[in-house]
Regions:
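Phosphate-backbone binding and catalysis cores of DNA-processing enzymes
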Residues: 1-151
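Loop-centered beta-sheet repeat module
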Residues: 150-208
């Protein structure tokens, strides 16, 4: 196989020469990175044959995913990417032990009790409707959140908000603005099974 043939195969496998429907593309490519939504939507648009700006968000979610970054991916893949410590932490609003953000931030100021209290406020809110990040901040402030607690709960690398996302409580809405909505219920896939499936998709559609 020549170098040019390899290039063509790679472009085809990534749906750049042979577009497919939105959900097929999203599943096979393990979603698209969504640090900047404009780029994510462009990446999807050039690979799909059913792209529609009015309905593009249907069937998709936005959450923390591969490489510890925010991706847009198929809602049906929530169990694959949001594995919640092999399901042990799925919708678990208890923070006495290890948590990713707390153990990454030496200055973490939220006690387990206060984190649970603020999380309850946020979970109840997004169960009713979508809330922006600023709206959630105002809601928590109105319920007694201090500045130092806010710096943890809404920390720029995700904070307590991220922990609620990766424990299956909520997702970002699929748009540029930082807005959150309750996640549909799902059953996380066991860690090893999920990693195998992600690797299978990667080596089928992305890797050389």
């Amino acid at each position: 196989m020549t170098l040019e043939e390899l290039k063509i195969r790679q472009l085809t496998n990534q749906y750049l020469l042979a577009p497919a429907d939105k959900l097929t593309v999203m599943r096979d490519l393990c979603g698209v990175q969504a640090q900047f939504m404009t780029n994510a939507l462009h990446s999807l648009k050039i690979r799909t044959n059913d792209y529609d700006e009015q309905t593009v968000a249907e069937g998709l979610v936005k959450n923390w995913s591969v490489r510890g970054t925010v991706h847009v991916f198929a809602e049906s893949d929530l169990p694959l990417f949001i594995r919640c410590n092999n399901g042990a932490d799925y919708r678990k609003n208890e923070w006495q032990g290890y948590s990713y953000m707390k153990n990454q931030r030496p200055c973490w100021a939220l006690t387990p009790e206060r984190q649970k209290y603020l999380a309850d406020i946020i979970i109840s809110a997004v169960a009713e409707r979508a809330y922006t990040r600023d709206e959630l901040k105002e809601l928590c402030r109105a319920n007694g959140m201090t500045k130092i607690e806010e710096d943890c709960m809404f920390e720029s690398w995700g904070g307590g908000i991220r922990e609620l996302c990766v424990r299956g409580f909520m997702n970002y809405t699929v748009q540029e603005k930082k807005q959150y909505i309750a996640s549909p219920e799902f059953s996380p896939i066991p860690e090893e099974e999920a990693k195998f499936e992600i690797a299978r998709r990667y080596f089928t559609n992305i890797a050389p």
